[in-house]
Amino acid sequence: YEIVKVQPGSEQDMDTLRKLDRTLEQRLDYLKEPRGLRDSGYLLVNPGNLRRVKRFLAEHRLHFDAKPLYVPSTRKRRALQQNNPLNSNEILSNYLGYEDQMQFVDRIAAAHPNIVKIKTIINSTERRPIKMMQFGYPSTTGEAKPIIWIDAGIHSREWISYSVALFFIQQLAQNPKYLPALKLIDIVIVPNANPDGYEFSRHTNRLWRKTRSKHENDRCYGTDGNRNYPFNWGQAGVEWNPCSEIYPGPKTESEPEVVGLIREMTSQKDNIKVYISLHSFGQQILYPWGYKTHTYPLDVMDLKSVGMKMSDAIRQYGGTIYSVVNSADSLYAASGASDDWAKSIGIKYAYTIELSPSDMSQNNEGFVLDESQISRVCNEMLPALDVLINTTLSEFLGQSVSLSSILYPHFPSTYPLITNELIYPPTLCAVPEKKGLIGFSKTTRSISAILFFFRTFLCIQTASYHFNHSLHLDLLNHKLITRTNINPREEKPTTIPTNKFGMVKKG
């Protein structure tokens, strides 16, 4: 395989790419489509089409740059034995094979039976169990608890998604900060939603995306599991060629992997309040609807607000920027996706999270993220999980749990410090040493007082600027008030009347 980088400079170049797409037996596999003129696109070209694609681009005078696919070696690990337990740190340094993943979750469940239930929701096409883990203490009220649902790896080449899910599992089981929350809510994690495709990508084709089913009269294997859900199935962003990477299957729910996920989620749909599907790559938090551009749910502002809180939390941890965008507007319209379906059955907060990296700029990594990056990506996603937990607690139960004391153990000094909800940039807001002004003139003391007030005012305003939600501090012993800030590129934020000191006006 080679990665072919193209950068259309005119509409004629865009037409050339579309023409190339039509001339091949199967649609071009875009790792990243060009979103307009002078925006780079990256094609994954298999050996059988490589010479043809290069010749076509050269004949049409479209500049391209081709490089061999960079695939770093992954450390092999033999199957676990009872006397050779998996060190939890290995999930942050290795891409584990399916068998190791399942033995890891089995041992987590066995070690923490009071808060973890494990269940096989279905077997894959090749008879591999697809397991889900449900974290939470039994309800003390007899009523069902709100649920956060997270699944990973429906696209098998997106290896980092499996690692993040396993890291979440390890943290929920072993980090004591989560125990109070687990008394109030449940968290479900499906760490490997496409085990057949994953093992095929490990041993045969590193960039394999689909499942491994083969349907009658289909000459190629696999269906795109994220085009197989029963919501506007087959309407946009699909190809009916079974060899295509975005083949939606011969019918909706044709894949056992999708059937199992749908069946289990449907049985708990009244309690699931948050749905997350982990993917890569792009560093994006995507919200519905994805089946059509410029089409949004009625509560899109709530989706944006919580998405921005997740993005802010990730950025606070280590500086990584995740954009919060509509999936169809940002990428392309694609129907039959899991987040659209989840939203359609009444789950309020439904997102697809495209993990790191942001692009293909470093060694063409994209999906092939080096194992050295696993720890960084996993750790920076933990604050986003905490946002979802607090959102579920506050919105659906009227509760709150402090997670911040253990949330940022290695918080970078170059990023703002956290004190509850108010953010203080460290340099600007450092408390000055008291030296006194005895002996200075009245004018000097007055100027100093004005400068101190101005400094305090800037501190509060900069705190608001640093993060995409605004905080108004009532200096006369009133509560801290948070208001949502809408993406400035899309819509103007709803303003709250304030006086000249930044305080919320009464009435």
Stretch-by-stretch model annotation:
Residues 1-417, 422-432, 436-441, 446-449, ...:
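M14 metallocarboxypeptidase catalytic domain recognition
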